[in-house]
Amino acid sequence: KKEEPPAPPPVEKPKKIEGMPDYSIRVDVPLVNVDVLVTTKDGQFISTLKKDNFKVLEDGVPQTISNFNVSEAPITAVLLVEFASTNYYFMVDALNASYSFANSLKKNDWVAVISYDMRPHILADFTQDKRTVYGALNQLRIPGFAETNLFDALYDTLDRLDQIEGRKYVILVTTGVDTFSKLNLDQIMKKIRATKDVTIFPVSVGFAVREYCETHRCGYTHGIGIPVSNIDYLQADNEMNTFARLTGGRAYFPRFQGELPEIFHDISGDIRNQYNLAYRPTNPKLDGSYRKLKVEVVGPDGSPLKVRDQKGKDVKYQIVAREGYTAKHTVE
């Protein structure tokens, strides 16, 4: 009788390398964060709302809010300033606005300063030192070029901010006029929609000069030999409103320099006192599509919430939140 060959040894299970994490394949639908500002018509933050008072709709479909809190925290912001050989008064306005913003900063805020003309210039990387911010602004003395390539500068800024986690803000001090950017309006709008957790607060400069020229019918140029009409500025104003609306910010158009401290006080209040909502979308597709958002403030019965003051009178309020976001796209 022939001997049976010995049974093969049992297959050893692969050994787990120490320190290496276990992996599993799953579809992870990222949380969508929505910062919401609810204020009275006078700009006062309404701080008494609860989680159940908020209703979030994505493409018209109600979402379940999983995370909710009220924040009063330090900010991470970029001060993006137009500084070019345009009009002397525009430059003065831009500097006054920039210093007003610097004055509004608090101890633990992180701020970077970028100026732009033909191209962006990083004057100060992110810092918590106010003196560094003032030092960066003190460099703005003699502008180099007449061009104001706003779209290129804003795109570059958003590209840098996209690498930073958490909520970020762009304080955009500008006339809003773009002269010769390589990018067009559609491209910068697409970039704004695709950049997560960024809110833009445009602050217009040069309004007094514009108003004077409209009244006295004087011609003016945006820089040396770059003719600009009132229609160009009106279009710029509309674009700044759009940048703010898309990201949940607000655009400001001061008529006088004396308004600037109050404007930056308002912006500081807006970005330090917000409701932070988060949800996992009912649409799990990671297809890179743009999803429209709508935030409502409701009562227990689902109807619009009525807010009353201490005297029992109805208070009109406004809700500020971004209009949408771009879903992640799976890597093929």
PLM regions and their residue ranges:
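Scaffold/interface architecture of coatomer-like assemblies
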Residues: 1-332
